[in-house]
């Protein structure tokens, strides 16, 4: 390839600069004030917006989980239980529903959620009765309290 003149060999920066500016302004169109028209202001605003959007992806997960937990806790209180008790007893019953599904059930399927709460409450009562026992010592176990006579 032969370059006949220096002006042909040097790359023209004009078109590239135009499209780079348009790309930044495209991302800044919804901003208020001069930030959506003035390139130097738009560059800073777009860069800051991208930083916020990166951080917001992680924050959104935490916020949504907190929302689901608060919804479940509110619905659980209506049935006379607390959130940790409901979740731990559902796990013991091998109910494989995540917080999002349980939260949606509490809003859109209240009867189904009521049956889940009843299941967890029944599991809790079984655990309490098993822990209390019938008051007798299990076979093969001597007294837990040693009496010296």
UniProtKB/Swiss-Prot annotation:
Quaternary structure and interacting proteins, as annotated: Component of the mitochondrial ribosome large subunit (39S) which comprises a 16S rRNA and about 50 distinct proteins.
Protein's UniProt keywords contain Transit peptide: yes
GO CC entries: mitochondrial large ribosomal subunit; mitochondrial ribosome
GO terms assigned for molecular function: rRNA binding; structural constituent of ribosome
Gene3D superfamilies named in the record: 6.10.160.10, Ribosomal protein L20
UniProt KW keywords: Mitochondrion, Ribonucleoprotein, Ribosomal protein, Transit peptide
Location(s), subcellular: Mitochondrion
Superkingdom, taxonomy of origin: Eukaryota
Protein name: Large ribosomal subunit protein bL20m
Matching InterPro entries: Ribosomal_bL20 (IPR005813), Ribosomal_protein_bL20_C (IPR035566)
Main location group: mitochondrion
GO aspect biological process, one term: translation
SUPFAM superfamilies assigned: Ribosomal protein L20 (SSF74731)
Pfam families: Ribosomal_L20 (PF00453)
Transit peptide segment: 1-9
Protein family (similarity comment): Belongs to the bacterial ribosomal protein bL20 family.
